Amino acid sequence: MARLAALTTLLALLCSVTCCQAEGYGYGDPGSGGGYPSPSPTPSGAGLAVGFYRDACPNAEAIVRGVVEKAVEQNPGVGAGLIRLLFHDCFVQGCDASVLLDPTAANAQPEKLSPPNFPSLRGFEVIDAAKAALEAACPGTVSCADIVAFAGRDASAVLSDGRADFAMPAGRRDGRVSSASDALQFLPPPSFNLSELTASFAAKGLDTNDLVVLSGAHTVGRSHCSSFVGDGRLNASTSDMNPALAASLRGQCPANPTAANDPTVLQDVVTPNKLDSQYYKNVLNRNVLFTSDAALLKSGQTAAAVVLNAFVPGLWEQKFAKAMVKMASIEVKTGANGEIRRNCRVVN
């Protein structure tokens, strides 16, 4: 702990003098101005474009944002769910809204019923509401995959008070394949160690920096006790979790969670409804739920990134915006490779 404290102090001091300026990470607000592209049709690396619907459905992004803002203001937990929904969609079959498909006679086990998604994944009703509004305004124009991407961006903006607001390229098409087994194969569980996490992200074209930055989304939302109790995180003799947090969690979680008895707990007890860099301070203080969270201190590279994100104002929000756009470009379907669903829950 003494060595970690020294590392924290040293890196914070170094960054305040040199590296933040050298990397162009100022202390200003990276919000809606923020240096990100203006909403005009600007190509992105995945064949997508910022402002994709400017001509075909000029109010598309405003419609989605209005629905998301209303939902998140009523229940901040839905915002956390929408951010997670984008991650869980993109890591399976790419960012193609495959996670939204309901079970059918032909496909009884789609992604949304896979253990990593059911019953914890949420926000589906917000996507439905946005799709209904868009179909009324611009029938058959805006894909469900783009709605998921816009909703993840807009939830980030609301929960961060505008500090993580950014342009989101669009032009995705919706996929027709959804498999529960694929979700199990590609979604990294909270029990993963650092090498497993790194490999999982690399398989989707994301690097270690993306891993550290996107893990920061655990600063909002709740988790089922079953996501960490079985990994020994509450074992006082073996876990590196802060004993005070572990004791609190033991009072909230059953020793052996079941489907009928699996409460949820806050992922960040300090600022639970705010998308901010508090997560990284929690990691340093060992006030995190998952093995995958604690794993960020297991290498010098990731530990240094945790320290910088924790102590440099505005740095994480800028990184998060870029990482979200990168993640939302995973294996996208464009043109004839997909469709634009009329109903996000079923293929056309």
Each model region followed by its residue ranges:
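Catalytic cores of secreted/periplasmic or lumenal enzymes
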Residues: A2-N348
